[in-house]
Amino acid sequence: MSDEEHQFESKADAGASKTYPQQAGTIRKSGYIVIKGRPCKVVEVSTSKTGKHGHAKCHFVAIDIFTGKKLEDIVPSSHNCDVPHVNRTDYQLIDISEDGFVSLLTDNGNTKDDLRLPTDDSLLSQIKDGFAEGKDLVVSVMSAMGEEQINALKDIGPK
């Protein structure tokens, strides 16, 4: 045995993978797919027949779930694609800070203070107006591949 000590620095975070493999031919419209490293919702799928050389191909048109940008990809239908683990969680809105962060109440009674207000103008104004009126608001937070963003709002009545 060696007397040397080895220090290992792990660059990856522990825990579950951000994506899972799925065969391209089985991914359907309104499913999720990773295109160019971004989690996307599939809006259109078309398949081409097998050519003289090669496989049938799937043409995916998808929208980035965080930025709203349209992305496209063509993959042989027998190949595996990365599919993001997408979670949607509802939190009660407690406070909006002046620097654009929100304070949210989790199910177990803790607060979550690391999310910014959404960039979508109509959703942003609905949240600010509802909060200013003193309504009880519940925001829906979508998370995938290490990113989180507020993407919907529910009004559960006055406080």
UniProtKB/Swiss-Prot annotation:
One of its GO terms (biological process) is translational elongation. SUPFAM superfamilies: Nucleic acid-binding proteins, Translation proteins SH3-like domain. Residues 1-21 are annotated as: Disordered. Lys-52 undergoes hypusination, a unique post-translational modification that consists in the addition of a butylamino group from spermidine to lysine side chain, leading to the formation of the unusual amino acid hypusine. eIF-5As are the only known proteins to undergo this modification, which is essential for their function. The modification Hypusine is found at K52. GO terms for molecular function: ribosome binding; RNA binding; translation elongation factor activity; translation initiation factor activity. The keyword Protein biosynthesis applies. Keywords: Hypusine, Initiation factor, Protein biosynthesis. The keyword Disulfide bond does not apply. Residues 1-12 have a biased composition (Basic and acidic residues). It comes from the Eukaryota. Pfam families: eIF-5a, IF5A-like_N. Belongs to the eIF-5A family. Translation factor that promotes translation elongation and termination, particularly upon ribosome stalling at specific amino acid sequence contexts. Binds between the exit (E) and peptidyl (P) site of the ribosome and promotes rescue of stalled ribosome: specifically required for efficient translation of polyproline-containing peptides as well as other motifs that stall the ribosome. Acts as a ribosome quality control (RQC) cofactor by joining the RQC complex to facilitate peptidyl transfer during CAT tailing step. This is Eukaryotic translation initiation factor 5A-4. It comes from Solanum tuberosum (Potato). The lineage of its organism: Eukaryota, Viridiplantae, Streptophyta, Embryophyta, Tracheophyta. The gene is EIF5A4.
